[in-house]
Swiss-Prot record:
HAMAP family: UbiB
Binding sites annotated in the UniProt record for ATP: 129-137, 152
A Gene Ontology BP annotation from the UniProt entry: ubiquinone biosynthetic process
Full protein name: Probable protein kinase UbiB
Family, per entry: Belongs to the ABC1 family. UbiB subfamily.
Active site: 287 (proton acceptor)
UniProtKB keywords: ATP-binding, Cell inner membrane, Cell membrane, Kinase, Membrane, Nucleotide-binding, Transferase, Transmembrane, Transmembrane helix, Ubiquinone biosynthesis
SUPFAM superfamilies documented for this protein: Protein kinase-like (PK-like)
Keyword Cell inner membrane among UniProt keywords: yes
Gene: ubiB
GO molecular function: ATP binding; protein kinase activity
Amino acid sequence: MIFGELRRLYLIIRVFLSYGLDELIPKTRLALPLRLWRKCLFWMPNCHKDEPLGARLRLALEQLGPVWIKFGQMMSTRRDLFPPHIADQLAMLQDKVAPFDGAQAKKLIEHSLGAPVESQFDDFDIVPLASASIAQVHTATLKENGREVVIKVIRPDILPVIKADMKLIYRLARWVPRLLPDGRRLRPQEVVADYEKTLLDELNLLREAANAIQLRRNFADGQMLYVPEIYSDYCSENMLVMERIYGIPISDVATLEQHGVNMKLLAERGVQVFFTQVFRDSFFHADMHPGNIFVSYEHPEDPQYIGIDCGIVGSLNKEDKRYLAENFIAFFNRDYRKVAELHVDSGWVPADTNVEDFEFAIRTVCEPIFEKPLAEISFGHVLLNLFNTARRFNMEVQPQLVLLQKTLLYVEGVGRQLYPQLDLWKTAKPFLENWIKDQIGIPAIVRALKEKAPYWAEKLPELPELFYDSLRQHKHLQHSVDRLTTDLRGERVRQHQSHYLFGVGATLLLSGTAVVLSRPEWDGLAAGLIAAGVVAWLVGWRKTS
């Protein structure tokens, strides 16, 4: 490692230890080297002993920057893994990160506008409405139409911090295949590259604006999800302006209940929104933590989600979507043979995998899951169990599925927080079955014909000419084949003749030589035989050339 990376690694270790996060090291024999290593760093004491562990973890991640804050946001949705006092603190990373100075934010906005804030906006609030890992948000009113908007501005000097951390993580990832038996199959560098791309994409607010416009268009005709309007004329790489929305944070269950929101329908609708994005649109909001999701105050009996912060989106290709949907259905039907075959067919495991052994391994790991009621089974954990089992059969990590799995865990966490009895399988199964039928049945054929209709309408007038050209090319090809066949037949005849002449010539030469050796007085006959042999050889050689 170069000096800069070592310095950053030292800083990370110092921050973690200064907040006493060594308490998280498990007291097991396997973790003994880590505990010994901690004792060696005795000059780095816990400087925040008065703070609870959850608060110390949150503050440490905030101090380390956006790469670590994003990780904390992801952990905050896993309330099945962390006690409430830690999960509640991590949830604050979603929209309550320490803000930077509002006056500095105003200067950044004016730099992006190329004009004073007052020239485009009224009522600009220098106090941020919310602050997150990548950017913070200020409220204002558009001068041109009086509409309330929020202005999102990227944090200053954030790019060097992200690049420094990612460079360090890349270097550590290169060691994973050398240190872990399964390291190569984990494809750590590819996973890190995917995570880095996700972070860097968030720094380009023009990309976020385009994502929001696409997502808004996808749900324009439905009641399930509302995406605020983007004011593209004011957007740049470092600044985004969008409609201000008023809604109830999805994590504020008490307020949702006070407003009479149908919690069961709201939870089920969240699952439907996710699967609609993934399978119908092939374009899904991949940062659906509670800080980015609200519920409209209107129509609480028919609740509508409001989604913001579209900086991270994901997509699956047609094949991955089909394999994923069929995997879910086969799993919940306990058809483990089908699950194994799908993993092989998709290329997720090598083609030479023993399907019987793979099926048995899946059955062994997954059958105990069905001891629980279906309402308690986690889709995210199903994927995790399947992929962990497949790793034993040389499955490589599929980066395109990592984002999906993370988002699915978000959706599950939020859904069960809203309605603990949520049965994800009951909600998702009809959608998945209908989607598969739609992909392979008559509707799929009709849809394909409709999609190709403009192409065929353009090509139809050209068909007679194309048909004539095809016949002409076929005729020319047939002439060429006939000519080649004749030439090949003649070549074979010539080769046969030359081989025959070589044989005759060799026989005459040997006969002439034998006569010379046995009957010197017959030298005339010998000379004739030898001469005839030479002539036969020359004629045979000429035919071969």
